[in-house]
Amino acid sequence: MITINSIPEPLIECDFENIYHPSDDSYLLLDYFRKKITDDSFDGIMFEEIEYLLDMGTGTGIIAIFFQLLNSLKPKFNPKIYGSDILEESLICARRNEILNKIKSKIVFFQSDLFKSFPESLRSKFNIIIFNPPYLPSSPLIKESLNKKGIDHSWDGGYKGIEILIKFFKELKEFINLNKTHYIYFISSSNSNLFELEKQIVDLGYKNEQLDKIHLFFEDIILNRLKFVKY
């Protein structure tokens, strides 16, 4: 099998101050994904088996666009790709970047607070879900969600830095295709309560694997891969 390292870097532009721009955590995801693409599979899953892919908290759209660009290189990789975000500005930015990368209207972008506004038709559909979540503990100034500004949604993970992730884990069971191989990729931080996060993961019936990490200043940024094991 031939590993592909020539997938184009998505062209990303965004003029909105409230939108999270691609950073080290974004590229931690992309670097891992590049290493796991072969001539006929992604991270051990055959291309033909991947029918639905979700980029949760899409931001500028960089992850969703990356996978849509992969389709242009490997037609057998042809899932329906979705990108969602809580901020309307993110969707505007992501759609502009889709056009910038010459893949207009191929990705379905829509506004949702996690899975809250997802249609019933997407239940039990997704083989691959990627979430680069807000993963840092709340600032004392924005303990209440009513005090959040737009950009705060990109980093504020709750009081312990894990509340958003735990809510995500509880909701996503309804949208994973449990009849096929499925993976959920997410980012976590050593500055959050990782011990409690892991306990919640196990209690909810998932198995988690740390795939990679990078150290930045006083923090480890960790790439994780999750699957549901308790039916």
PLM segments and residue spans:
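Auxiliary N-terminal substrate/complex-recognition segments of SAM-dependent methyltransferases
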Residues: 1-231
